[in-house]
Amino acid sequence: PISGASISFPETTTLNFQSGIAEDTLLYGAIHQGKWSTAQIIVPENPNGINPATGAADALVSPIGSSFDDKIHYSIGVGRKVSDELALSISYAREDGGGALTSDPFTFRNGYDTYSVSARYTASENVTISAGYTYTTAGDVKVVHEAAPGVPSGLTLDYTDNSVSGFGFKIGYSF
């Protein structure tokens, strides 16, 4: 543990909605706001010269702090009951970025776009099979390390052309 370190959590508000737009078709979505500007991570300067990550003697470790911005996340999707056995859905989600250049060491993306598809098949009265796929592209960001507040150290991290894919599969049995 580091003496004087602190972390706080954001105040959040979420508005979910859904509405039938045709027989067996559902439109759904959400707006999620996080007040991240009031929820920061702060690690103070380490005056004893011991690197808390390695436990080894080190030069004076600079203070580290986040500079999170307030964020709004939007999502929208459509679900369709194709038959008594099969239901499908597709959705899209987006969060705008806070800028392509930052000194915040906790920032690894500049917004994102997410695309998802899923299906649920009722094989029998007791068995369901569900599967889903999600693809997310993260916005590019360059993190510039500061040796002291406002003084670049020359160390930069480039997070570019990043994406993540996820797949889920479930077999459900009820009795």
Predicted regions and their residues:
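Outer-membrane beta-barrel porins/channels
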Residues: 1-175
